[in-house]
């Protein structure tokens, strides 16, 4: 197999922001004006970047790979997740070589924007990892990364991942590693812990980006493109100069009766179900400004969609479509608002 060692990210556009709507969603829903629309239809219309785990969402991934090969100029980025967490949480062994074979098959690695490394989760699901397991996981992840880049057709599309709680020496290693052609790794994943409050994530991001800038300056390399795994906290995305973020919130929140709307750089989750009517986040208890923001999104979406129609939708399909459209309104108007030092090289 001949490998292509070119950097696929030279001179890529950073706008609109690559907010990746992970997950599939419903197939088709009848909108108030009679239009049939599924989540995939809206994603294609809005040119939403996509992310699917190869071992848990293979059908969706294969469908999108085929669509992008048939529509090469559609402007949609496809990201492949390793699914390592999914396998770990189910107690299944992860086969790195099977993952590599899948990436090389059907030209998926050619089509995709990037593919995540096979990162190693310490310990077993539901059991606290030992200190030895916690310290060994980043090294095993790095070994998997090195194994992968020697065996896929586009090595520079493999993204290594730095996790919250890991020693910063592992991030520095990613930033200073050079391929055999002398290039540095162009795209790096940053993964905060979802069980940590936002204030703690912000502290970690501050330190992480300081390490990125200090290290890049020291070795004389450009600031890498970065991806925030499992993060759609708007103020974090606006504060730090990442290239992309992914989350399934649009889908998961819809399933629990919630819609998402961005107000003053904050993502508000609004309960529009007939449960928890006294909850401060219920639509009945929202100020006029929030209701107006929801009405504005509905008006831009069109197809007769209104807040009342969303409330009356028992299946949650309207909520999912609203969430996709609402977050897209934010991403297409994205403005970096962070530290000037962090902004200078990327934004």
Language model: regions and residue ranges:
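Conserved, mostly hydrophobic/aromatic
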Residues: 81, 160, 240
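C-terminal accessory extensions appended to soluble enzyme cores
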Residues: 1-9, 255-347
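Amphipathic, non-transmembrane alpha-helical secondary structure
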Residues: 61-65, 93-104, 139, 143-146, ...
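Non-catalytic, usually N-terminal nucleic-acid engagement modules in DNA/RNA processing proteins
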Residues: 1-153, 282, 287, 295, ...
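Glycine/Thr-rich beta-alpha phosphate-binding loop at enzyme active sites
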Residues: 126-131, 157-233, 248-273
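Alpha-helical structural signal in soluble globular domains
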Residues: 148-152, 211-218, 239
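A generic structural signal for alpha->beta connector loops
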Residues: 75, 112, 155-157, 223, ...
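Structural recognition of alpha->loop->beta junctions
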Residues: 100-114, 173-190, 239-248
């Amino acid at each position: 197999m001949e490998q292509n060692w070119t950097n696929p990210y030279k001179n890529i556009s950073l706008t609109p922001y690559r907010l990746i709507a992970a997950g599939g969603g419903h197939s088709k829903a009848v909108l108030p004006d009679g239009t049939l629309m599924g989540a995939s239809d809206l994603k294609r219309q809005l040119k939403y970047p996509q992310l699917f785990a190869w071992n848990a969402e293979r059908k969706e991934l294969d469908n999108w790979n085929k669509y992008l090969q048939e529509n090469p100029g559609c402007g949609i980025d496809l990201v492949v997740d390793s699914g390592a967490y999914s396998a770990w949480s189910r107690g299944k062994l992860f086969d790195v070589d099977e993952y590599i074979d899948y990436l090389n098959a059907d030209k998926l690695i050619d089509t995709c924007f990037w593919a995540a490394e096979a990162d190693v989760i310490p310990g077993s699901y539901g059991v606290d990892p030992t200190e030895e397991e916690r310290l060994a996981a980043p090294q095993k992840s790095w070994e998997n990364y090195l194994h992968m880049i020697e065996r896929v057709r586009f090595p520079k599309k493999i993204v290594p991942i730095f996790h919250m709680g890991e020693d910063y020496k592992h991030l520095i290693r990613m930033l200073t590693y050079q391929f055999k052609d002398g290039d540095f790794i162009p795209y790096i994943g940053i993964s905060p812990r979802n069980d940590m409050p936002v204030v703690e994530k912000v502290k970690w991001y501050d330190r992480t980006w300081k390490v990125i800038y200090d290290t890049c300056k020291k070795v004389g390399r450009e600031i890498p493109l970065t991806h925030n795994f499992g993060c759609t906290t708007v103020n974090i995305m606006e504060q730090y100069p990442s290239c992309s973020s992914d989350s399934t919130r649009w889908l998961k929140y819809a399933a629990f009766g919630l819609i998402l709307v961005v107000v003053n750089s904050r993502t508000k989750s609004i309960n529009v179900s007939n449960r928890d009517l006294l909850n401060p986040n219920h639509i009945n208890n929202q100020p006029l400004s929030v209701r107006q923001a929801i009405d504005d999104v509905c008006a831009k979406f069109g197809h007769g969609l209104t807040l009342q129609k969303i409330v009356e939708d028992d299946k949650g399909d309207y909520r999912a479509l609203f969430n996709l459209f609402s977050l897209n309104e934010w991403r297409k108007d994205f403005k970096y608002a962070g530290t000037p030092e962090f902004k200078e090289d990327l934004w």
